[in-house]
């Protein structure tokens, strides 16, 4: 059986990256919450 996680840098960035988060209002809310919480890394 193959593993379900087959990492790809481009896919990770495009789906969960900073620019993707900034492109929608809800994504910006995600970043705001993570800033408020004090996350060192905001997005992938």
Curated annotation (Swiss-Prot):
GO terms for biological process: translation. GO terms for molecular function: structural constituent of ribosome. PROSITE patterns: RIBOSOMAL_L34. Residues 1-22, 30-44 have a biased composition (Basic residues). It holds the Pfam family Ribosomal_L34. GO terms for cellular component: ribonucleoprotein complex; ribosome. Keywords: Ribonucleoprotein, Ribosomal protein. InterPro entries: Ribosomal_bL34, Ribosomal_bL34_CS. Residues 1-44 are annotated as: Disordered. Belongs to the bacterial ribosomal protein bL34 family. This is Large ribosomal subunit protein bL34.
